[in-house]
Amino acid sequence: MKCMILAAGYGKRMMPLTKETPKPLLKIGNETLLDRNIKHVISNGFDEIIINVSHHGDKIKEHLIENYKDHKITLVEEPHPYGTGGALINAKDHLGDETILIINADIFHDFDLSKLNRETECIHLVGVENPDHNTDGDFNIGPDGKVFCDD
């Protein structure tokens, strides 16, 4: 099963940490965010990974070559970050027609990916409540677990 990891952003909110290091290669403890996500998807049965890169993409590429030689990882380069939709269009030749998981490289999570229905033709969106320090967002999760948008 395929997974696309979105790793092309500038990481502006993490400056100055991301001036020389791409956000996916920032460490939490002894492990980068990207490593944590790659290991998580591999351990959940994803055997083909597509990663888009842009800002400091050469550093991500070098990291992957050093650490994931034995895994099927395809890099899709962007001259500048295209955003989520642009990244998917740019990578369309690698995505195919099968079900695919799309995640952000800079997300720290422990979501049980086995809960996703891999045979469905619909989209699953995994969301979490906005934290108290950042209450603005595009959508929220109500007490019933349903997604809603504030007007």
What does each of the following model-derived ranges do?
Residues 61-143:
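Conserved beta-loop-beta/alpha segment of the NTase-like Rossmann-fold superfamily
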Residues 1-60:
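N-terminal glycine-rich phosphate-binding loop and ensuing alpha1 helix
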Residues 149-151:
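Conserved FAD/dinucleotide-binding core of flavoprotein oxidoreductases
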